[in-house]
Amino acid sequence: TGLASVAGGFMLLVPPSEARVYMTPGEAAKLFWGNQKLIPISLKLSRQQRNDIKEASGVAVRASKMAVWKTESGGWFVLDSVIGKHEYIDYAVALSDKGSVKAIEILVYREGYGDAVVNPRWRAQFYDKDPSRQLTHGKEIMNISGATLSCRHITDGINRLTKMWELVFSKV
């Protein structure tokens, strides 16, 4: 029930042997929101919403169903994944009630290299970024040599999620 079962359903891919699990979705939720109650939001994006998000963020929305929870204080807990170079990177994001990034944690990293994106200093670049700005990998968000595609795709994912907040979550 609750976060564990929905989050468990979200993690559809079986990590290959080189996958590194840094945190569970439940641990990330606790880290981000403490003991606040997380209310699961049943969210299925329409084709029009997916197109609008793609147009606003420049990033395609692959799935119509999202793993999303709203906090008692109006914040959001979102589970998402992006492709690294060849494999998926699962991550969790906390968004404020205004859609700005409060925190990001890498949950599972499946690539054989390039996992420097788990570095807290690199992830901190996203904090306080909101839907009003399109983040650019290599400009607002620094690259990490050896993790270029992971950096770029996580940046794209954050842009997609903040625009998703603006166009969808904020209206829930």
Language model features: what each stretch is:
Residues 16-144, 148-152, 156-172:
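Flexible, solvent-exposed loop/hinge segments and secondary-structure transition points
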Residues 2-18:
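N-terminal export signals
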Residues 1-2, 99:
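An N-terminal domain-start capping segment
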